[in-house]
Amino acid sequence: FDQVYNRYANDDEIKKGDSLAAALDKLHIFQIFEGNPSATKSLFEILNGVVVIDLSGYDSDIQSLIVAITLDLFYSQMQASGSSKMEGNYRQLTKLILVDEADNFMSEGFPTLKKILKEGREFGVGTILSTQFLKHFGSGDDDYSKYILTWVVHNVSDLKNSDVDFVFKTEAKSQENQVLFNAIKGLTKHHSIVKIGNNKPVYVQDKAFWELYQEAH
């Protein structure tokens, strides 16, 4: 990044003082990215196993910058990697992105996030958007629900009947809607209702993190 920044800063023909300059200055001041090219790897090389990008502690504008750059890099390298392998009706899963508190990013309307959601399957890339409320998926002009085929719904504190219609495609004020509404409100910890495509909802007992830990040890 230092090479890019220095070339940009020392080029008098490039107009300064705009939003791009402000973004580069912040990334440079906070030393977000590695400055030494020999110490860097491609994003896909780093994504081996579980990799957590912790953005807590940064201002929201810096978080948005990092997310936008990371998503753009991921998308370009995803396409360069080519289509994933097929085995019968099943496609190889190569990468899985989990976005926690996804409403913070969905509200930004990142174009690349939508591209990954829309095109990722061909490249074996799955995406999980985790958020507290169902309304976050369809607010404003950004309707993320059209890119989602699988829903895993836990207990929702401010659930509305319209949310049930939105996810489960039930008719408003129908008996099915009310049954699902009551079921979701009554879900206990580590229990969920799963909706896959056009299939009927399935009640699931989730495997808790401590159960996975016990199995591993």
Residue ranges: model-predicted function:
Residues F1-E122, G138, K185-G197:
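P-loop NTPase motor domains
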Residues E87-N89, K95, L134, Y144-Y147, ...:
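Active/binding-pocket-proximal capping segment
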Residues L98, I148-L149, A208-F209:
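Short alpha-helix boundary/capping motifs
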Residues P201-H217:
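Charge-patterned, long linear interaction tracts outside catalytic cores
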Residues I62, K160, E211-Y213:
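A broad, structure-centric signal for solvent-exposed, well-ordered loop/edge residues
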Residues A68-L71, F168-T170, W210:
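Short, solvent-exposed amphipathic alpha-helical segments in soluble enzyme
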Residues K114-Y203:
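Conserved ATP-driven motor cores of ASCE-family P-loop NTPases powering translocation/secretion/packaging/pilus
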